[in-house]
Amino acid sequence: MPLTRIAPTPSGYLHAGNAINFLITAEVARAVGAGIRLRIDDLDAERMRPPYVDDIFASLRWLGIAWSEGPRDRMEHERMYSQLSRLARYEECLHVLKEQGDLYACSCSRAGQKRSACDCRKRERPFNAPNVAWRLHLPSDAVVRVEPIHGEAQWLSPSRLMSDPVLRQRAEHGARPAYQLASVCDDADQGVTHIVRGEDLLASTACQLYLAERLGLEAFRRVRFLHHPLVTDATGAKLSKSEGAASLKGMRESGQWPDALREQALRLLDGMRAGTAQSSVP
């Protein structure tokens, strides 16, 4: 059976951009006859708060989205579904990549990587050196095929879309596995077949498809993707938790209903099919 997923991060209260992504995901699931798995990406323990996890369940129920797999509340999530219970699996994947020579230890900041000033791979720093992250090398000649839910397939070069991503954080951040690795491992292991994302995550999709190739995760390489336009405010700025976008919690508590968000999600999806998609909220 086809399966898609909703995978929020509990680093703040959800906003309209999250809601529209969830609603588009639910509509895609309905159209292709897929189940929906709820996965809460909770590896970032420093920013996670219990009220943010509770907000995910409250928001999905307020939006009228039913899911067929995953936790029903915070306690069940912590007991049975937390990504922290999969650390051994992520370490197994890191070991495979390390043995294949796909990883290198890096002490550079994100800014240093973006300036292409990093020479850590050439210097072959030890993986157990202090204050290093483990990065995935993206070869300049690597190309991946992105299978779409709507439209034509794309061929993308991961290295042209992003610098080498961190797959394991520095020790000061708990040496924990990073988003790109956990996301592709979870999607592959959980049988996800359809993924809906904002277009700002196209680079992540390319990176994860290459990562799946290196890990032999063939199921992920067959996943179909839909990358929707970003949901912006009236000024054209992307909605985000860090910028204080109006929360769904605030909407619920003020007595608002999600009808306008549902209509906007359907308009956006119809626009994508017709090639005219735009999305902003007042």
Language-model-detected regions and their locations in the chain:
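N-terminal Rossmann-like or analogous alpha/beta NTP/dinucleotide-binding catalytic cores
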Residues: M1-A117, E199-L211, L215-F220, G271-G275
